[in-house]
A protein has these predicted regions:
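Sequence-level preference for short, compositionally simple segments enriched
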Residues: 2-7, 17-326
Length: 326
């Protein structure tokens, strides 16, 4: 890897350990609406300026309606601006794009540091590796680093390290995530439901890739759950995931796996694999044959599997039900 991901992850976990666990209050309704349009026929012309207008310490839902267009800007939601709902016209018509690479903590096109954030119908793209750069480097489309964050019908497009699903509880519903190497990575506690993971290196020769890269502490509840998803791609083969330390956790269930999935399925960067939890249950498709998988994958059934597939895995207190219907 071009960037030593384990270093940044360990730094992240240290920072998290030194901060208070998020006790995020629910946001109040009804939402206030502000608009964004590049034509100027709106409250703001850029997404960032609309976010900047939200008062510090905000506790009421703010609906930011984004008109169709390609917004070439880097967008940051700071920690003191929770309760924001960004809504576009769909990934095919509303996109936020930037061209940057390097440290994943600071170079993402879309960077979330606040809790209670929702995005719907928006594409987030890092275009660095999709042009003739001559190299494939860490280039993050979105970094998600707080609690109670949801994405509906969104797209995340990149090549290496597309989605930095860093920390907190997250829900991805009906989303499309595209990349080539570790394109969903981090230490978050997240559920991906009815979503598509598409492997594509985007440039260069056909090479093998990695869908996920997971790292967690032994006592954390974190991990990635993929439920009713479509895992596919083109231009090579990819493993479902790799563990960056001794405790990675990824569950793939009731999903369709194409033949893009390599027979061994998984790998670990740590020599001790006994506490890694890589699980495949109830899947279909040519890539779902587990006969040649690495021997240390886990099998879960009944309540052991249900604890991860149930929404309570990421939502015990009902924060998703508090999201406005927009």
């Amino acid at each position: 890897m071009q960037v030593p991901k384990f270093f940044f992850f360990n730094l992240s976990m240290l920072i998290i350990g030194l901060t208070t666990v998020c006790k995020c209050k629910d946001c109040s309704k009804p939402p206030k609406t502000i608009t964004v349009s590049q034509s100027g026929n709106a409250n703001f012309k850029t997404v960032q300026s609309a976010i900047d207008s939200v008062p510090s310490g905000n506790s009421q839902w703010v609906h930011i309606q984004i008109s169709p267009g390609v917004y070439r800007e880097k967008v940051l939601i700071e920690r003191d601006k929770p309760c924001i709902y960004l809504k576009g016209g769909g990934g095919g018509s509303t996109s936020i794009e930037w061209n940057d690479h390097g440290n994943a903590h600071f170079t993402a096109t879309f960077n979330i540091k606040a809790s209670n954030i929702v995005a719907k119908g928006i594409a987030f793209k890092n275009t660095y590796n999709t042009v003739d750069t001559g190299k494939v480097l860490q280039a993050v489309a979105a970094r998600v680093h707080e609690d109670k964050i949801a994405f509906y019908d969104c797209e995340f497009i990149g090549v290496q390290d597309t989605l930095f699903d860093s920390y907190g509880r997250h829900y991805y519903k009906g989303c499309y995530i595209q990349g080539g190497v570790d394109f969903i990575f981090g230490s978050a506690q997240s559920m991906f439901e009815g979503s598509t993971l598409f492997f594509s290196m985007g440039l260069g020769p056909k090479v093998d890739g990695v869908f996920t890269a997971s790292e967690r502490e032994e006592d954390d509840n974190s991990g990635y759950v993929f439920k009713n998803c479509n895992i596919t791609g083109t231009g090579g083969k990819a493993i479902l995931g790799r563990s960056l330390n001794a405790y990675g956790r990824v569950i793939v269930a009731n999903s369709v796996l194409s033949d893009v999935v390599r027979p061994e399925g998984w790998e670990s960067l740590h020599h001790n694999v006994s506490k890694i939890t890589f699980v495949e249950e109830g899947n279909a498709g040519p890539g779902a044959n587990t006969w040649h998988r690495v021997p240390w994958t886990k099998h879960l059934s009944g309540s052991g599997l249900h604890q991860f597939l149930d929404m309570s895995y990421i939502d015990k207190e009902g924060w998703i039900a508090n999201i406005p219907s927009l």
